Amino acid sequence: MRHQKSGRKFSRTSAHREAMFKNMAASLFKHELIKTTLPKAKELRRVAEPLITLAKVDSVANRRLAFARLRDNEAVGNLFTILGPRYANRPGGYLRLLKCGFRAGDNAPMAYVELVDRPVVAEAVAE
């Protein structure tokens, strides 16, 4: 019986799943917006939100914990220099999921995962 075993398997081994979410979290912290399937986006919240909470207190120990989970220096740098101070006064809920239709090949539900309060880049509007 699998009572109280939380988390989805995604038809992957545990190592593959762990690597996938490390890479997705690192991409999210670098780009602040990623597009993925809706189930993966929902599961990514369980990985990314605790890391942002960890980044609120900038210490060598916390940086090492974050690096152990992400294995990406650039992502850890962004996490502690940009995202930690940005969310210092927010008690959680750092990510927003926006549904964006279905993938053409297999009709999988897709979603954008973005960081809340991210700066909006003004795009040039053709007149």
Curated annotation (Swiss-Prot):
Annotated GO biological process: translation
Residue intervals passing through the bilayer: none
GO cellular component: cytosolic large ribosomal subunit
Pfam families on file: Ribosomal_L17
Gene Ontology molecular function: any one: structural constituent of ribosome
InterPro entries: Ribosomal_bL17 (IPR000456), Ribosomal_bL17_CS (IPR047859), Ribosomal_bL17_sf (IPR036373)
SUPFAM superfamilies: Prokaryotic ribosomal protein L17
Entry keywords, A to Z: Ribonucleoprotein, Ribosomal protein
Record family assignment: Belongs to the bacterial ribosomal protein bL17 family.
Subunit structure: Part of the 50S ribosomal subunit. Contacts protein L32.
Matching NCBIfam families: L17 (TIGR00059)
Listed name of the protein: Large ribosomal subunit protein bL17
Source organism of this protein record: Stenotrophomonas maltophilia (strain R551-3)
